[in-house]
Amino acid sequence: MYRLSSSMLPRALAQAMRTGHLNGQSLHSSAVAATYKYVNKKEQESEVDMKSATDNAARILMWTELIRGLGMTLSYLFREPATINYPFEKGPLSPRFRGEHALRRYPSGEERCIACKLCEAICPAQAITIEAEPRADGSRRTTRYDIDMTKCIYCGFCQEACPVDAIVEGPNFEFSTETHEELLYNKEKLLNNGDKWEAEIAANIQADYLYR
C-alpha cells in the first residue's frame, strides 16, 4: 500500500524539474511517483523473517543430519565386522544348498545311476542327455550322461526325481571356467565330482532325510 505525503510534493516537483521533466503531465507524474511511500512494511519484514527462519532451519537440519551420519559411521568402527574375508573365510551352507552337480557311487565303487532317465525327463531346461544299454546281468547302466551347465537353472528337480540318490547337487559353488566347453559336463566329470564331495554330500542327504 502506498500513500502520498503532501509535505514532500514541492521537493519532488523541484527534483523532477532538475532531471529534465519540463512538461506539465510528466512533471506531475514524476513528482507524484517520487512522493509515494510503502507503508505496509510489516508484511515485507515478515516475509524476510520467514525466509531467514527457513534458511536457518535448513542449515541446522543439514548439520544435524551430517553429525548424526558421522556418529553412526564412527559407531560401526568399533563393532564386529558383518562380512567375511572371502575366499579365505567361507560362511556356512545349508544341507539343501544346490551347487555343482555330481554322480555318486555305492561304497563298493559301483555307480548308483540305473539309467531310468527320470532326471532327463523332469529337467525343465532340458540340460540332461542320457544314453544307456543293458548289461549282461540284466541291469541298465549309462553309457553317456551329459549335463549342459549353461542351461541348468539349479532347480534341484533331477535330485528330487532320482530314486537312488545318484545325481545330486553338491556343496561346491566355486566352479567358474574360462571357456564354454568346460561347462559341458560328461559322465566322467560328474563321477569325479561325486568322488571328491562324497563325504559332504552324504552328510547333507542324511541331515535332510527327515524332511523329505
Curated annotation (Swiss-Prot):
Keywords recorded for this protein, A-Z: 4Fe-4S, Electron transport, Iron, Iron-sulfur, Membrane, Metal-binding, Mitochondrion, Mitochondrion inner membrane, NAD, Oxidoreductase, Repeat, Respiratory chain, Transit peptide, Translocase, Transport, Ubiquinone
GO molecular function annotation: 4 iron, 4 sulfur cluster binding; metal ion binding; NADH dehydrogenase (ubiquinone) activity
Domain of life assignment: Eukaryota
PROSITE patterns referenced in this protein's UniProt entry, alphabetically: 4FE4S_FER_1, 4FE4S_FER_2
GO biological process: aerobic respiration; mitochondrial electron transport, NADH to ubiquinone; mitochondrial respiratory chain complex I assembly; proton motive force-driven mitochondrial ATP synthesis
Cellular component, GO, one term: mitochondrial inner membrane
Reactions that this protein is recorded to catalyse: a ubiquinone + NADH + 5 H(+)(in) = a ubiquinol + NAD(+) + 4 H(+)(out)
Top-level class of the enzyme under EC nomenclature: translocase
Positions in coiled-coil regions: none
Membrane topology term: Peripheral membrane protein
Positions with a binding annotation for [4Fe-4S] cluster 1: C113, C116, C119, C162
Complex and partners: Complex I is composed of 45 different subunits. This is a component of the iron-sulfur (IP) fragment of the enzyme. Interacts with RAB5IF.
Protein name, entry field: NADH dehydrogenase [ubiquinone] iron-sulfur protein 8, mitochondrial
Lineage: Eukaryota, Metazoa, Chordata, Craniata, Vertebrata
Encoding gene (name): Ndufs8
